[in-house]
């Protein structure tokens, strides 16, 4: 299985220009430019002793980031694996810009209570990635990423360097939550399991692609409920906590009823449809490459 976010922003590589300089002969004492001559009769001067070259400064190579193990990938995605597909897509893309996450969270703290129009006006001139701007509509998610910068950065690196294993880990955890009876359709969300018809095998996968995948969508197209759950309980196995990850304020169990997955107030996303960071510009396509025409406007 080769899952894809259906909105990819590609960064170009800078070109390095090498500028050379032409050597010039030095003027003599009378200010005349000396000309090289193969038949010059001037006695050769005593060669200047060659000075030992100054050793070049040692270049310290930056070690490549270690590839997370399968167990580490489970631990890394456990807090967000049960998010609705479109929100998960935004979180993964935004995690590749941890500095922008911090800047946006700081802006919202300094300007609390912005209505939809004021929020859009504040976001439009910012040079942030569309995924980061989109999370402004989900302040609890944004704040969680901001207060756990080490986890956020690790999530972004894993998505950039090993997205296949990362997304396979998401599906493994979703399937385990389904098997435990905790992940299911509710008035807030629709959960659908589908069988993979065409299996794509990638050499060296740390997390084998599952035979089925689980989609999570809002029950109402324009109202999103962000799930709250304890990763140590909802999957039937405790994968531990990623170093530097801090749970939401108030823990995981305040006000829950009817299961291990709770929901707060619904977030209306209809007002954001016409903006490039709006909810419907994001999506997730499981089980293979995205269909033709998915492009930058997302796959629905």
PLM features per residue range, with description:
Residues 32-67:
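Post-signal peptide N-terminal segment of mature Sec-exported envelope proteins
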Residues 80-81, 87, 91-206:
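Mature extracellular/secreted ectodomains of secretory-pathway proteins
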Residues 11-15, 269:
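Hydrophobic helical h-region of N-terminal Sec-dependent signal peptides
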Residues 25-27, 165-173, 178-300:
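Low-complexity, repeat-rich tail regions
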Residues 2-11:
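Bacterial N-terminal signal peptides that target proteins for export
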Residues 65-91:
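Mature N-terminal segment immediately following signal peptide/propeptide cleavage
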Residues 20-23:
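C-terminal motif of bacterial Sec signal peptides marking the signal peptidase cleavage site
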